[in-house]
Design a protein with these regions (language model features):
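Catalytic phosphate/metal-binding cores of nucleic-acid and nucleotide-processing enzymes, i.e., regions
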Residues: 1-112
């Protein structure tokens, strides 16, 4: 029996939150954390990041990124799409300008 897309989306959000916790970040699904707050982010707990989670086999990256950008407008946060296919690792998609901004602030950019 196939799982419906809402259940699969919720499962993907829990999986991504768990991955974040494995890396030391206290991330939770938005609904589980605070109900319907008007925050369209799928998960919360990474300050200044709008997280759109997609758990699909065939992702339309442009559409998913457009949704993340739209939902993060006027919030001064960086939109990302966290996505994973079956039997694959999680990937993060973000705008190049945002990636360069993060890289400049990281320890990696100074060779440490």
């Amino acid at each position: 029996m196939p799982i419906n897309s809402k259940q699969k989306g919720a499962r993907g959000e829990r999986e991504f939150a768990s991955l974040c916790k494995e890396h030391g970040f206290d991330v939770r699904r938005t609904q589980q954390y605070c109900g319907n707050t008007g925050d369209a982010s799928d998960c919360v707990g990474l300050p200044n990041i709008h997280i759109e989670v997609k758990r699909v086999q065939a992702l339309n990256v442009d559409k998913a990124m457009a949704q993340a950008i739209h939902d993060s407008e006027h919030k001064n946060v960086m939109p990302i799409v966290a996505h994973r296919k079956n039997n694959a690792k999680w990937l993060i998609t973000m705008r190049a300008d945002d990636w360069f901004e993060m890289y400049k602030e990281s320890r990696l950019s100074n060779g440490s």
